[in-house]
Amino acid sequence: MMTNLFSVFDPSAIFNLSLNWLSTFLGLLMIPSIYWLMPSRYNIVWNSILLTLHKEFKTLLGPSGHNGSTFIFISLFSLILFNNFMGLFPYIFTSTSHLTLTLSLALPLWLCFMLYGWINHTQHMFAHLVPQGTPAVLMPFMVCIETISNIIRPGTLAVRLTANMIAGHLLLTLLGNTGPSMSYLLVTFLLTAQIALLVLESAVAMIQSYVFAVLSTLYSSEVN
């Protein structure tokens, strides 16, 4: 039994070299190969997914969105999805379960949106602080509420992704630790439950990467 359930998320070192975070960038070695190799079925399916995301993000950004602005969110989706799936494999470091990575993705994006909006569309940003139809008495409270909700956006983005990744891995760890003390019959049910949970975690990995990218797109559309 582990002394600490969260030890599965601890970075480990090989020959005193911390190579865990390098797994985050393995996608950069695999994805570019589609540009000089014959496209496989995997490449065709992946390109169709990216095209669908491009159309959806373009709709969310609206007509005022700049050309090519969807590609940053598609890249964000691809990076998070790849690392979420990599973390499901045994003995591979789960980088998206650390706020170090998720907050470093969410905070610079939000900060860029805020700087761009307040510098170029100041009146538009002030108008967002008071929703349409708000009574005059409630306007000061709405300004405070909208300001707080705006400030905590990068934190909620980062914590949502991290918490979902940690929760699933902890459940798999808890179930796995009970295996040695079970009979063969119960181990069969345990393996079935773990496989079902692994399928659920795969769905969560896709959903959370999509949610992160869509919310980032919506936040950027508010400053245009």
From Swiss-Prot:
Record protein name field: ATP synthase subunit a
InterPro entries xrefs: ATP_synth_F0_asu, ATP_synth_F0_asu_AS, ATP_synth_F0_asu_bact/mt, F0_ATP_A_sf
PROSITE patterns: ATPASE_A
Keywords: ATP synthesis, CF(0), Hydrogen ion transport, Ion transport, Membrane, Mitochondrion, Mitochondrion inner membrane, Transmembrane, Transmembrane helix, Transport
Membrane-topology annotation of the record: Multi-pass membrane protein
Molecular functions per Gene Ontology: proton-transporting ATP synthase activity, rotational mechanism
Protein's job: Mitochondrial membrane ATP synthase (F(1)F(0) ATP synthase or Complex V) produces ATP from ADP in the presence of a proton gradient across the membrane which is generated by electron transport complexes of the respiratory chain. F-type ATPases consist of two structural domains, F(1) - containing the extramembraneous catalytic core and F(0) - containing the membrane proton channel, linked together by a central stalk and a peripheral stalk. During catalysis, ATP synthesis in the catalytic domain of F(1) is coupled via a rotary mechanism of the central stalk subunits to proton translocation.
Listed transmembrane segments: 17-37, 72-92, 99-119, 125-145, 170-190, 195-215
Subunit structure: F-type ATPases have 2 components, CF(1) - the catalytic core - and CF(0) - the membrane proton channel. CF(1) has five subunits: alpha(3), beta(3), gamma(1), delta(1), epsilon(1). CF(0) has three main subunits: a, b and c.
One GO cellular component, as annotated: proton-transporting ATP synthase complex
Matches recorded under PANTHER family: ATP SYNTHASE SUBUNIT A
Gene of this entry: mt:ATPase6
Family: Belongs to the ATPase A chain family.
NCBIfam families: ATP_synt_6_or_A
Cellular location(s): Mitochondrion inner membrane
Gene3D superfamilies assigned to the protein according to its UniProt record, in alphabetical order: ATP synthase, F0 complex, subunit A
